[in-house]
Amino acid sequence: NGFPDVESAAEEILLISIQDYNTKQIRTWGLGQFNNKQDNVIYKGFNTEYELLLSFINWWMIEDNTPEVITGWNSELYDIPYLVRRLDRILGEKLMRRMSPWGLVTEREIYIAGRKNISYDIGGVTQLDYLNLYKKFTYKAQESYRLDYIASVELDQKKLDHSEFDTFKDFYTKGWQKFV
């Protein structure tokens, strides 16, 4: 499906983006250069994943930067576990634990339909997974819970079209500007 496996977390992280919903400012760390044309975006480009992750965790560990709440679609079972595992693999456990203001990052196994999933509790940071919230608080089952499908049903919007690229890898290697 184009997404790297969470358990092995074998693929490099290419981008990390965070939006402050109070200021609307977006901060992005990327594995490559980007021609930023938006006033509300701060983009930092890096040559290696190590540099990207180190810059990110150094920013995150500053008390005023560590969010009280993080949100995302399927972030509990994908984004956060993948990020935590890559931080641990590339920077080591000590820096990975800085995701928590208290140094408390705990792995959990969650079984859904008999399939093992990995999740992490980050002490001091509340995680709100929009996929879980959507399933819990909407009373109509959907044929799919892919973000693109739900955005279409609920907002009449689609994710960014990248059909001009044959593969997802082509998208981020040949269309970096659009990918970011």
Which residues does each PLM region occupy?
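Non-catalytic, well-ordered alpha-helical scaffold segments
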Residues: 11-13, 81, 128, 145-148
